[in-house]
């Protein structure tokens, strides 16, 4: 099982569903290290604040997220079903979307996921999947996105959805 990449062993992708999440920019790179295993690294960034300065309407899902993980492909890398796990870190500030409550902090943990890669061309896949992640977070909760009134802070464990995946993948 060589650790050097060759043709059809390197891929880049972007998750279209992240763009729906208030414009999150994202990319993932992957390298196959065997017939059934690929190593992945991803980054997501959302720097946007909407209706800034309007306390009643301001909302944001600002974050920077980094993950490194592994995928197991029962049939062959970049084809068919897959299962994944990753270590993930996120610095975040989100609020004003469903309620005025806003939380910011740092989170780190492990994610577990699965999905299916549909080959639509020799070099292009359409990937579908879901993942969950859990870990530890340190946070501060504010009454609203712009008021600065702290209502809670601390550290706690969490378990929550991580990704809804509809990705376009290019395989070199």
Where are these regions (language model features)?
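Sterically constrained small-residue positions within well-ordered secondary structures
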Residues: 3-5, 30, 74-76, 157
